């Protein structure tokens, strides 16, 4: 994580081009806030489902990691992660957050989820160091939509903030074990 040294100021992270550095600072601040919220959760809290359509906090955390993987493939490698069998095997279930996620993403301690999130984020950060701001603004077609690399990575923290709100809501309502 990027230390804030008692400051809550978004500035370009060192070692990156200016705009990528701001993106990295934003991604990392978002992640730090998520980790602070979940770092002490029990397996009961991570696995709790309110109903048969619900997604547990553990599944949401794996979903956050899966977004890094998906956008690494699109923006760094120019391919869909669902076209890579080894990535499908590991990340399709958390990416989709459906019945298989409710059944399969269970029973893990928080350290498991945090390690998964950290591993994929470390790869994201290493890859972002290899690119410049021109790459960040590169536009491509995603079906009928024009999208740039910045938007993909913006969506990573946008989605994380949304799911963190969902996690907060859940934590205020999960009954004690």
Which residue stretches match the model-derived regions?
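Short, contiguous alpha-helical
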Residues: 2-10, 24-28, 32-35, 45-96, ...
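Hydrophobic alpha-helical core bundles mediating ligand binding, dimerization, or RNAP-core interactions
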Residues: 27, 31-34, 38, 117, ...
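Conserved catalytic core of Hanks-type protein kinase domains
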Residues: 40, 63-64, 127-130
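Acidic/histidine-rich alpha-helical segments that form the ligand environment
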Residues: 93-136, 152-156
């Amino acid at each position: 994580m990027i230390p804030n040294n008692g400051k809550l100021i978004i500035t370009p992270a060192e070692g990156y081009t200016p705009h990528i550095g701001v993106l990295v600072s934003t991604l990392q601040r978002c992640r730090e806030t998520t980790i602070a919220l979940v770092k002490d959760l029990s397996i009961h809290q991570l696995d709790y489902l309110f109903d048969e359509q619900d997604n547990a906090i553990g599944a949401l955390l794996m979903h956050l990691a899966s977004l890094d993987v998906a956008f690494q493939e699109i923006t760094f490698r120019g391919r869909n992660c669902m076209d890579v069998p080894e990535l499908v095997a590991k990340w399709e279930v958390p990416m989709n957050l459906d019945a298989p996620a409710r059944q399969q993403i269970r029973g893990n301690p928080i350290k498991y989820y945090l390690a998964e999130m950290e591993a994929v984020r470390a790869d994201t950060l290493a890859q972002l160091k290899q690119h410049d701001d021109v790459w960040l603004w590169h536009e491509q077609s995603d079906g009928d939509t024009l999208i740039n690399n910045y938007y993909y990575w913006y969506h990573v923290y946008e989605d994380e903030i949304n799911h963190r709100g969902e996690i907060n809501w859940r934590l205020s309502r999960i009954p004690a074990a």
